[in-house]
Amino acid sequence: MSTGFFGDIQKVRYEGPESDNPLAFRHYNADEIVLGKRMEDHLRFAVAYWHSFAWEGGDPFGGRTFDRPWFSNEIDAAKLKADVAFEFFSLLGAPYYCFHDADVRPEGRNFAENTRYLNEIVDIFEKKQAETGMKLLWGTANLFSNRRYMAGAATNPDPDVFAFAAATVKTCIDATKRLGGENYVLWGGREGYETLLNTDLSRELDHMGRFLSLVVEYKHKIGFKGTILIEPKPQEPTKHQYDYDVATVYGFLKRYGLENEVKVNIEQGHAILAGHSFEHELALARTLGIFGSIDMNRNDYQSGWDTDQFPNNVPEMALAYYQVLLAGGFTTGGTNFDAKLRRQSLDSQDLLIGHIGGMDCCARGLKAAARMLEDGALSKPLDERYAGWNGEFGKRLLSGLSLDQIAGEVEAKDINPQPKSGRQEYLENIVNHYV
């Protein structure tokens, strides 16, 4: 039954590249076959509950701009929000959604009330998933908004906060498992510091390692089959976060023996904040064997903030999905739109239009990436660039020769290598040809 929030808008359909209907897909065709698989199954789109239904349109200089009928801290408002959210999911046709506990329930007086509220909403979600066919990509706990977490959750100097956070995560993993969630995410927005003057780095890292170990232990205890994911971000809201980027997270996982238990959920905007490209973070995660899922958005390249806009850069998406395809595609992960409307975008249809544009952009990127992969457009030049390592001398360098033996061969054979072109402009033109 319609809530009336979206008026008379009908389910979004694929109408093809020539369509000028802003409420139709021009490039995302869920059933189109790409590399032998349906486009929907490649992209595995998800809607973020927090930005789409919980964000009020505020910024550091001004408060709420959105006027939503569910904006109150009451359980009935949370139920209305759920009705609107699942109506939106059905209109858009994305197969998945994601949520934090605080997105979907009111803030209770204590842990017990929070848990009761969460379970009440999960009851509703279970029914709505059965009715609509929607699935949960991942669940997570909000361990950063409430003032109790101002000095962190897992890394808080107060053990009571650590305990409250751990108990909250336990309830959120339970909810995720109950809803058939395919992953569970941890984002350490307050796991870091503002100043080293009041921070014990060694203690805080050990506490974070202990916290994550508890999560992994509980996952196995209850038989949760999903993937545990960490989402890297260098700063904001803290000055420095411990899960700075993919490389930092991998080092952390190795230190605490969790590299085979936990993967990463990589956000485009967080990669940019860390001084990396999106494809760099994806390529490194793939190389290190910890690629899990992505949060799709974009940052404003001038402001330096994590602006969480909808993606609109097809060449960037092509290079990103090229890395996803090289990784073998998503398994339990997917493409979650961690993107929000601009605070002046007040109309209900703006929420659909933002997601439609993002899904079309990703579809174009996926198709370009698939063509590059099929044609060997980038892999063939790469193979040529490293061909010398496939020869007899290259293999001996990697698996037998000592340093003094190498020096002897260089002198005996008068090895005097000359540089070869990296052909960057040629490769960039290849990408432009496909997009």
Curated annotation (Swiss-Prot):
One of its GO terms (cellular component) is cytoplasm. It catalyses: alpha-D-xylose = alpha-D-xylulofuranose. Mg(2+) 1 binds at E231, E267, D295, D338. One of its GO terms (biological process) is D-xylose metabolic process. Keywords: Carbohydrate metabolism, Cytoplasm, Isomerase, Magnesium, Metal-binding, Xylose metabolism. Binds 2 magnesium ions per subunit. It is an enzyme of class 5 (isomerase). InterPro entries: Xyl_isomerase-like_sf (IPR036237), Xylose_isom_bac (IPR013452), Xylose_isomerase (IPR001998). Its EC number is 5.3.1.5. Belongs to the xylose isomerase family. HAMAP family: Xylose_isom_A (MF_00455). Homotetramer. This is Xylose isomerase. The gene is xylA.
